[in-house]
Amino acid sequence: MDQEKVIVIDFGGQYNQLVARRVRECNVYCEIYSYKIDIEKIKEMNPKGIILTGGPNSCYEENSPSYRKELFELGIPVLGICYGAQLMMHKLGGKVITPEVGEYGKTEITYSANGVMFKDLPSESVCWMSHFDRIAEAAPGFEVVAHTADCPIAATQNVEKKLYAVQFHPEVLHTKNGTQMIYNFVRGVCGCAGTWKMDSFVKNTIDEIREQVGDGKVLLALSGGVDSSVLAALLAKAIGKQLTCVFVDHGLLRKNEGDEVEGVFGKDGSFDINFVRVNAQERYYSKLAGVTEPERKRKIIGEEFIRVFEEEAKKIGKVDFLAQGTIYPDVVESGLGGESAVIKSHHNVGGLPEHVDFKDIVEPLRNLFKDEVRKVGLELGLPDYLVFRQPFPGPGLGIRIIGEVTAEKVRIVQDADWIYRSEVEKAAKEYKEAHGEEPSWMPNQYFAALTNMRSVGVMGDERTYDYAVAVRAVRTVDFMTAEAAEIPFEVLQTVMSRIINEVKGVNRVFYDLTSKPPGTIEFE
């Protein structure tokens, strides 16, 4: 992309993607690179600014991630965060030490009026610390502009050389006014104009798709999730009938989800594309019969999806391009971007159907974060219920049903989940109408799951022996950690009452209070 950008050099920090997201919130394009990136490539890119991330190492130890001193002599503004700040000081003649105790969590901090990154911010505030080593002496030419009780040099700067170092993490929400600090760096120090906006992205990307595809045919496996739905809408705007979307309904979707997807992209929808819906429910239920082990269920569901998709692709005939809803975290987490990111092999990076004949792939969303994908969806006119869908696992309800998957169990969890989500959304809407803001308890993800447990109950004058449903709701910033949401008790009572009275086969409802860790958000 030929545009102004800031690059993030990753030294193994857990917040590398968060740094890039905060930069993009300032309407500045940003990419993540490993600390192994060659300095000649940086010169070639000529970024408006460079940000060095945190990391788990000590900068003065042998074999620790490092970078050439030349980086700080390019004349490009550099911001070092935590490990990145220590590395900057270490390379430029400062001193970094390992004290007896580290500094972790929310910390009171004092900013100097001279601090360029703290312009117009209160002098006394709170920041997020997560370090053991610390800067003991600033490098020559640097001015100390922030301190805490245990960290005398919490921030330092060399305004003339446009070099800035902060020991805390401005990218984390716990740092008050942290986003403004990053704004002051990228828009102030770096001089970025802030032209990275989704309306211009859509326009430019449509042109790029048309140039890449020409008059070729494109095939997309449409799951109905946010990424694939936005991708379908974007491709539809660009190439219309040259796009064929295959939607495999495996019977493990949320209630009414299949019909919602068809309503948007099918013949009665607003997009002029070729839409194929494959109703494969019985095929999946047959394959899953008797299977209880979670990973085995995942594998069956994934493999069967590829088989069904390949069968439909053969019916369509030759296609030129396969479209994938790869987004930027997929690229980073697959080790193709930053250093800390070799976490898992993502299904959209390196996993392609073997028996579909195509010459290239189309991945127009691969540079976007999830929140940006949603903005593109709104820009393209997709309905809110598609754009703001909650995260949903690839195996669908197959891993929200503990034990064997059957048609009856799918019906139970679909109905219970629909009731639960409806009541939470209703309560949140009523609160917002009354108070003018979203309730503090509003979860980021909430769903029902079916336990593999039956229990004795009494309904009317009869004894029952039915399933127990568990409902889960979590609040989280990054889905890496999560806490149980404190949904009002009266809302949970309503949910319990409705599920037991309206969903046949259920006589007990549990509310899951487990945080992540030790639990995971999903049950399997």
From Swiss-Prot:
The gene is guaA. It is an enzyme of class 6 (ligase). Homodimer. Residues 196-389 form the GMPS ATP-PPase domain. The active site is at 82 (nucleophile), 169, 171. It catalyses: XMP + L-glutamine + ATP + H2O = GMP + L-glutamate + AMP + diphosphate + 2 H(+). This is GMP synthase [glutamine-hydrolyzing]. InterPro entries: Class_I_gatase-like (IPR029062), GATASE (IPR017926), GMP_synth_C (IPR001674), GMP_synth_GATase (IPR004739), GMP_synthase (IPR022955), GMPS_ATP_PPase_dom (IPR025777), NAD/GMP_synthase (IPR022310), Rossmann-like_a/b/a_fold (IPR014729). Residues 5-195 form the Glutamine amidotransferase type-1 domain. One of its GO terms (molecular function) is ATP binding. Keywords: ATP-binding, Glutamine amidotransferase, GMP biosynthesis, Ligase, Nucleotide-binding, Purine biosynthesis. ATP binds at residues 223-229. Catalyzes the synthesis of GMP from XMP. Pathway: Purine metabolism; GMP biosynthesis; GMP from XMP (L-Gln route): step 1/1. The keyword Nucleotide-binding applies. CDD domains: GATase1_GMP_Synthase (cd01742), GMP_synthase_C (cd01997). It comes from Agathobacter rectalis (strain ATCC 33656 / DSM 3377 / JCM 17463 / KCTC 5835 / VPI 0990). Its EC number is 6.3.5.2. PROSITE patterns: GATASE_TYPE_1 (PS51273), GMPS_ATP_PPASE (PS51553). GO terms for cellular component: cytosol.
